[in-house]
Amino acid sequence: MNVLIHGFGAMGRIVEEVAHAQGVNVTAIVSPGSDEHTATLSEVEAPVDVVIDFSNPALLPALLAFGRERNIPLVIATTGFTPEELAEIETASQDIPIFQSYNTSYGIALLKQLLDQLVPLTLGYDIEVIEAHHRKKVDAPSGTAELLARAIEAKRDVTPIYERTSRREARATEELGMHSIRGGTIFGEHTVLFAGDDEMIELKHTALSKRVFANGALAAAATIIDRPAGLYNLSNLYEEATHVTHKRL
């Protein structure tokens, strides 16, 4: 598998490191403004089977154009897209396979599956989503928190509430509280709290290093490389991992 890494910040470097450890061939690195690596996708001449993108939303048009022009699958793990940009990704997926997720860890894929099963059983519980990240993360709530919120909304009629300081009223049952913590060097922690009368249930995922996201991105690349055009997500990653586990058993 020949991989092009698009965006060579902290995550791009870790993807390269993990790829080499797994024996995956990194044939190109594109890092805008870099003197060390290729600056734009249009300059890439090396063979590429799949692109792993940890860049920023401003580079999305060039990324989608590159994938379509060269018929190359894309793993898009960049965060902070607008609804319009997500729509552009969905449109492009009609021509090429695209995996898009704000979080590429298998643990989050598993957490989403658990929510699909648990949320319909908790109609008498109030649900809150709490996420914590390092002090340098600029977007809040995190894309993963939003992903979890969408999973909850798919199973219950709730409305996300992002702040309560201006509200002077009791919490409504249909609210979905969203909370962000920023500090230190926290890689990423996401908790879904189900608060009932006299008891609480918590589902929690903690990333212990950024390697978990690199592993997931490479697994996603392997998952979609031979798939038909379409939009793929964490559910596909979970299904593939489950299939492999069952084969081993």
Feature locations, PLM:
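C-terminal substrate-binding/catalytic lobe of Rossmann-fold NAD(P)-dependent oxidoreductases
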Residues: N2-I5, A10-E45, L123-L249
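Short hydrophobic/aromatic-enriched beta-strand-loop microsegments
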Residues: V26-A28, N71-T78, P97-Q100
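Short, acidic/turn-prone active-site loops that include or flank metal/cofactor-
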Residues: P32-D35, T79-T82, N103-T104
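Short acidic/histidine-rich motifs immediately flanking catalytic phosphotransfer sites
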Residues: V44-I52, R68-L74
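Short glycine-/small-residue-rich Rossmann-like dinucleotide-binding loops
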Residues: S55-N56, T79, S180-R182
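Rossmann-fold NAD(P)-binding glycine/threonine-rich loop
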Residues: A58, L64-A65, T78-I98, A109, ...
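Rossmann-fold dehydrogenase core element
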Residues: P73, E88-S105, V119-E128
